[in-house]
């Protein structure tokens, strides 16, 4: 139980390193120390107790020792050290794009200290007998590790607040914008679809613009990926790190998202269930539409998460609100029927996905026609819903027809939106993430199991893509080395707006034609803090 208490005390600063914005006062820190220590004593200590009891059946000596055995203590603290080491290094690896570099470095230091502690204990347990005052020495050694881990957390620099404008900055955007996000699409799926003739509009526009793959957020989390796309900032800066957030009222008033991964189910690493579910977080930096609205443009948004607000907003339709599959074009339904009959267990889900996508597209086109806007941002999840279930393992399968019809629907919606916005509109089509089969390592885990059908998924953060076409874009250009955060920075530059210094993205100059690059300077502002009234703080129309 004492070993478990030390484990809880050592894991607490690792969890705090995952929460850079949490800086509790001393009293709350003491409460946190007691909470995690008692949690570790019960759960980790209870596990170690069961392990020691089981081991005593094999090694009777362990059960015959009276009092506090220093030798047994060392052998119990070795797995504690291994758990702390693994937790520090694993969470550092699993927060590549989600955590500030200083905090990830703190996890690396913590893992190294725990590894050194474990190796030292292993050497002592094997090669040395307990000396005089061995108990005091053992407890002091473990206390030193806990102290060092808390010192690592205390010495980690706090995050910098967003730079504020001294006065309102005045900018005048140029042109119109159509910003389309197709989740779950990528070039390996898109290019063949265009070659087959499934996407004639996009194929026609392809040579008029610049395109390339996008490195997405790693590890994959949809919430962080979308927020990175529309803010141009890293997740650690815009603050949206995952789908689920929690409130820990006895520690901080701020919602927290990242939880320490380890051999325990989430969210039970938060002690004693003293937490509450929190609603989804909104980005702490202004989104693309907020920046545009702050300059005076009318912006429509459709299909984005709940934090999206524009001059008008089309939310993601619910199943009950959609017109239904029966209301779709008869020729479209007739082309789908053979494929749907081949997989009746998936047919209802596919019909629902098509109906929702069609409802979102038609509602958005109607809004643009009746309430014209200067910019439109729309997000569609159709491909992300259908590809994992309908991707065919063999060419020529009837399953392919479902995805072909999905490509045709997306292309037709894109054409309708582009015509509604006007031909002189800057067109941006982007996929924040792609889909790919499981990696060889994931397949190896299931080696020897029952035969299974592998599904494509975004788990390994496959690359997405970006396509830009319109005023200021260099035609017939292949982009290389582009990242997801680069999209918003490039769009702002093409619309004659400044780029924020705290954005992780850069302007994709290869996508800009020479005339614009020579005539339009790259302007920078400190930041675009989110204004909860709907705009970007410190930016106004000229």
Regions found by a protein language model. Give the residues of each.
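Juxtamembrane "helix-exit" motif on the non-cytosolic side of transmembrane helices
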Residues: 10-27, 86-101, 125-128
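Polar, surface-exposed loop/tail segments
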Residues: 436-441, 479-486, 494-529
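Beta-strand elements within well-structured catalytic alpha/beta cores of enzymes
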Residues: 170-191, 205-206, 229, 292, ...
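Active-site-proximal alpha/beta segments of enzymes that process anionic O-linked groups
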Residues: 44-68, 73-100, 104-120, 174-175, ...
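Histidine-centered active-site microenvironments of extracellular/periplasmic hydrolases
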Residues: 163-168, 430-469, 521-522
């Amino acid at each position: 139980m004492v070993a478990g208490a030390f484990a809880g005390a050592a894991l607490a600063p690792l969890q705090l390193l995952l929460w850079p914005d949490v800086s509790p006062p001393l009293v709350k820190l003491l409460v946190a120390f007691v909470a995690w220590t008692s949690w570790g004593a019960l759960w980790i200590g209870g596990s170690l107790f069961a392990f020691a009891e089981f081991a005593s059946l094999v090694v009777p000596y362990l059960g015959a020792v009276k009092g506090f055995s220093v030798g047994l203590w060392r052998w119990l603290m070795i797995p504690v050290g291994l758990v702390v080491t693994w937790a520090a290094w694993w969470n550092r690896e699993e927060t590549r794009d989600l955590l500030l570099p200083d905090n990830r470095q703190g996890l690396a230091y913590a893992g190294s200290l725990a590894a050194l502690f474990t190796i030292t204990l292993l050497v002592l347990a094997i090669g040395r007998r307990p000396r005089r005052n061995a108990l005091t020495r053992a407890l002091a050694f473990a206390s030193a590790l806990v102290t060092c881990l808390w010192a690592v957390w205390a010495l980690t620099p706090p995050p910098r607040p967003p730079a504020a404008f001294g006065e309102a900055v005045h900018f005048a955007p140029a042109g119109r914008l159509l910003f389309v996000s197709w989740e779950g699409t990528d070039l390996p799926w898109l290019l063949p679809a265009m070659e087959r003739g499934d996407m004639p509009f996009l194929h026609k526009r392809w040579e008029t613009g610049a395109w390339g793959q996008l490195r997405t957020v790693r590890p994959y989390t949809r919430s962080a990926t979308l927020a990175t796309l529309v803010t141009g900032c890293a997740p650690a800066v815009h603050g949206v790190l995952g789908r689920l957030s929690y409130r820990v009222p006895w520690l901080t008033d701020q919602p927290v998202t990242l939880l320490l991964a380890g051999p325990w189910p989430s969210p039970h690493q938060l002690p004693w269930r003293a937490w509450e579910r929190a609603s989804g977080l909104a980005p702490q930096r202004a989104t693309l539409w907020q920046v545009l609205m702050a300059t005076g443009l009318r912006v429509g948004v459709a299909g984005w998460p709940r934090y999206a607000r524009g001059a008008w907003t089309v939310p993601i339709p619910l199943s009950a609100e959609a017109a239904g599959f029966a209301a779709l074009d008869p020729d479209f339904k007739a082309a789908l029927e053979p494929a749907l009959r081949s997989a009746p267990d998936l047919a209802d889900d596919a019909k629902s996905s098509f109906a929702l996508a069609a409802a979102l597209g038609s509602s958005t086109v109607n809004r643009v026609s009746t309430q014209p806007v200067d910019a439109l941002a729309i997000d569609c999840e159709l491909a992300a819903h259908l590809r994992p279930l309908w991707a065919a393992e063999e060419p020529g399968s009837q399953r392919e027809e479902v995805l072909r019809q999905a490509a045709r629907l997306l292309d037709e919606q894109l054409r309708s939106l582009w015509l509604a916005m006007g031909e002189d509109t800057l067109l941006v089509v982007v996929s924040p993430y792609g889909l790919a089969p499981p990696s060889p390592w994931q397949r190896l885990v299931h080696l020897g199991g029952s035969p299974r059908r592998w599904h494509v998924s975004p788990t390994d953060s496959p690359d997405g893509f970006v396509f830009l076409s319109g005023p200021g874009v260099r035609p017939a250009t292949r982009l290389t080395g582009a990242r997801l955060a680069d999209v918003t920075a490039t769009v702002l530059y093409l619309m004659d707006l400044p780029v924020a210094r705290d954005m992780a993205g850069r302007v994709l100059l290869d996508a800009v034609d020479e005339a614009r690059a020579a005539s339009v300077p790259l302007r920078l502002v400190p930041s675009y803090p989110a204004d909860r009234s709907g705009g970007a703080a410190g930016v106004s129309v000229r």
